[in-house]
């Protein structure tokens, strides 16, 4: 079964709500809410203790998805990446997304190129999270969102950028 928007099913005796929240990480992002169990399965909307990677965007959809998860009556949140969390984990991912959006916008508006911008964004508040080099993809996606047609979308180029940043940070 495919769906758009929201789809509710009864599985056994449990109500299960499937909610479309993308595109964000990819074009087909959805979460699953089991209200009776106060549990949300977020798929790739949440990366806990790791830098998320924005392949599709727009990033505003991802921020909105985090906001929506925060409104659900859920105490158990199962991310697509990393350990189970609570709403504090959702808030940290949201904080990261807002931060990189705002920092990338400043650099874009100042005329800085996407790779240079990715290199210059401090990630101190997210130290200890894995895969910091993903900032390269995130900034390129944001630059395209800001209207910069020169920011690459080719996965091969973006993986090359991530490799450069990984080497730079070691």
List the predicted regions and their residue ranges.
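Solvent-exposed, non-transmembrane amphipathic alpha-helical segments
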Residues: 62, 66, 82, 89, ...
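Short acidic-hydrophobic, aromatic-tinged amphipathic segments that line or gate anion-handling sites
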Residues: 1-5
